[in-house]
Amino acid sequence: MKIGRYTSGLHRGLLIALAACSSLSTGSLTIQAQAQHASGGGTYFVAPGMRSEFQFNQAHVQCKVGHGVMPDGTVMQMFMASTSIDSVSIDSAAKTVTITGSMVSIVELRFTDGTTARLTETVPYTAFAKDNSASGGADFFSLTVVYTDTPGLDQFDLFGSPATFAGDLVTGNVVIK
């Protein structure tokens, strides 16, 4: 009988200790997740009349121009999406994030003579975002990519290298915690 009571008391104590430890463990994971968060989405203008849409989080970055007309009349569509994330640096005090990695950059062109071209390249990138909500200012997003110059028509010819697509947000927001 004494052994039975001792054993059940031991089980009760062990359960209480396990419950206490698990709540401590869960608590610190929650705090860490809250302290390291960066995400955003919205639109900004990369050139007058040329709106860009972006989304990012700590696992993915993408940016696109759904429709744009270049100075020579060429119609352009662009889509860029990360294929890897190499680093994520969050500065919670400054409310900024810098994300680096590789992404695919695809540009569809329709020239004024009716011909078309599709340009595809995998490029290194650096995405940067700033959450300006505390100051009441517009949030900011930029995406810098490094294009390769090749003998034929390529994205280097269109945008140079490095090329930075950046602006204050017109819609959407950036959240850095």
Which ranges hold each PLM region?
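Bacterial N-terminal signal peptides that target proteins for export
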Residues: 2-17, 26
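C-terminal segment of classical bacterial N-terminal signal peptides
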Residues: 21-32
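Boundary/junction segments of secreted and surface-exposed precursor proteins
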Residues: 32-47
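Predominantly extracellular/secreted and cell-surface proteins with exposed
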Residues: 44-129
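Short edge-strand/loop segments of extracellular domains
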Residues: 131-133
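Extended soluble regions of mature proteins
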Residues: 136-139
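Edge beta-strand at a domain terminus
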Residues: 147-177
